[in-house]
């Protein structure tokens, strides 16, 4: 049976992006200073999750992330507490009505990473 292992995104500043995703609960589990293609790589993972987010920085590459290209999703047992924590740190949580309950009783919100990738925050439980 196949297993979904990782998702790779390009980033404009590897250290800045690692720090940003740490605020969401990710840990940097591995770094490669220079791949055979000349990229700097970091592999992030939420403890207990099998999926890995691979960050790829290529010196000299002009990063442009088209709006609504893709998003990742992270679940939290207390979405209100996580969003309040992020807002206190200056993160913009959207849409404005994220506190409403959506179909099937769940709530969701979004936050945008430093390069423009959207991260969906889902209430779990």
PLM feature segments, named:
Residues 12-15, 67, 72-118:
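Vicinal oxygen chelate
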Residues 2, 8-50:
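Core segments of cupin and vicinal oxygen chelate
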Residues 30, 121-125:
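Short beta->alpha transition motifs characteristic of CBS
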Residues 44-49, 111-114, 124:
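Active-site beta-strand termini and strand-to-loop segments that position acidic
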Residues 35-36, 62-64, 101-103:
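Short glycine/serine/proline-enriched coil/turn segments at secondary-structure junctions
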Residues 49-53, 64:
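Arg/Lys-rich, alpha-helical DNA-contact motif
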Residues 3, 40, 51, 68-70, ...:
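Residues that flank catalytic or metal-binding motifs in active/ligand-binding sites
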């Amino acid at each position: 049976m196949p297993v979904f292992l990782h998702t790779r995104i390009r980033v404009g500043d590897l250290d800045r992006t690692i720090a940003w995703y740490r605020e969401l609960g990710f840990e940097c589990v591995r770094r490669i200073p220079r791949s055979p293609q000349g990229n700097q790589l970091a592999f992030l993972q939420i403890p207990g999750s099998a999926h890995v987010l691979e960050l790829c920085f290529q010196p000299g590459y002009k990063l442009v992330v088209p709006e609504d290209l893709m998003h990742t999703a992270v679940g939290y047992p207390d979405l209100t507490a996580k969003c309040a924590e992020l807002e206190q740190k200056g993160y913009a949580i959207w849409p404005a009505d994220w506190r409403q309950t959506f179909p099937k009783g769940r709530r969701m919100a979004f936050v945008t990473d430093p390069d423009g990738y959207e991260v969906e925050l889902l209430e779990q439980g």
